[in-house]
Amino acid sequence: MEQVVIVDAIRTPMGRSKGGAFRNVRAEDLSAHLMRSLLARNPALEATAIDDIYWGCVQQTLEQGFNIARNAALLAEIPHSVPAVTVNRLCGSSMQALHDAARMIMTGDAQTCLIGGVEHMGHVPMSHGVDFHPGLSRNVAKAAGMMGLTAEMLSRMHGISREMQDAFAARSHARAWAATQSGAFKNEIIPTGGHDADGVLKQFSYDEVIRPETTVEALSTLRPAFDPVSGTVTAGTSSALSDGAAAMLVMSESRARELGLQPRARIRSMAVVGCDPSIMGYGPVPASKLALKKAGLAASDIDLFEMNEAFAAQILPCIKDLGLMEQIDEKINLNGGAIALGHPLGCSGARISTTLLNLMERKDAQFGLATMCIGLGQGIATVFERVQS
């Protein structure tokens, strides 16, 4: 079976969904920009040699509809002979895109794939056109379709206080801002055209979603966003609404070596699981455990974790049940997470994996694990092993 390697991993800056940098930029353009950038950064790869493109996107309608993967590839002037498919596993879409490509390579059906994902939540809101089947209420609580209420449920089940949530959210912003200031994101962010507050065209090379002024004290004044009577989850402890894309160049190790391209990491294992929709945010726990089992590793073997921060109330129970509460500041989301950077649904799986790979290189780490919860009760995880140059 072929070894699957990540040769390159990049992303756009994360733009605010409400009047942000990409308010006049379409999702297809964000995607095409990264496809072109991957090829420009790796000139040894001919575009005609790409076997397939897998692109995650959740709200596949309006500008994100009609197979956005193919539309973006055509915009990027990738040869017409290269196919492309859009993948949807809700929040896990672009990580699923990675898994799909990896399996193609493992089985010998492909040698080279572009993967990634995009979501423009400013142009296509998360709830746009959603119409749940009435019969679902026979099997699933209606509140299970309301992500904030599932986070409230988890916080109550696991004893996660409002104070713990506020502290974690403040940490996310502080770490993301520190990473920005230190240049830690420089190798992953591709400068991307947008418009400033005055409508002037500008190249953005930083995440505009981060709020460096965030404090626990300020967060403590916010009202509950989903359960106004007894809730603890606020807008400040939830992932921000943002627009963005992320992408990776995935190859068989043999093809990468043949082209003289240095692999950055191998995919050691992959896992996806289902869980109770009412606690959808718990999915990373069984997904991570399954991925670790497949890799022949324990949580203690993992040097760095990237766990998508859908809500502080959601990620903290996952950290707790993976036995990592005492290691948060050494191992988990060292450059902040979705609370500070936002969670463009179809983009996030590739985004957290990209950030993880860069952190693994900076920290000289051997193993990293990226994982995320998925709406309606699923979890997805990937274990990466760094390839020494």
Curated annotation (Swiss-Prot):
Top-rank lineage group of the source organism: Bacteria
GO MF annotations in UniProt: acetyl-CoA C-acyltransferase activity
Catalytic function, reaction form: an acyl-CoA + acetyl-CoA = a 3-oxoacyl-CoA + CoA
Keyword set includes Cytoplasm: yes
Pathway(s) this gene product operates in, as recorded in its UniProt entry: Lipid metabolism; fatty acid beta-oxidation
GO cellular component terms given for this protein: cytoplasm
Location of this chain's protein in the cell: Cytoplasm
Listed EC numbers: 2.3.1.16
Main location: cytoplasm
PANTHER family: 3-KETOACYL-COA THIOLASE FADA, 3-KETOACYL-COA THIOLASE, PEROXISOMAL
Role, per record: Catalyzes the final step of fatty acid oxidation in which acetyl-CoA is released and the CoA ester of a fatty acid two carbons shorter is formed.
NCBIfam families given in the database record: AcCoA-C-Actrans, fadA, PRK08947.1
Assembly behavior: Heterotetramer of two alpha chains (FadB) and two beta chains (FadA).
Protein name, entry field: 3-ketoacyl-CoA thiolase
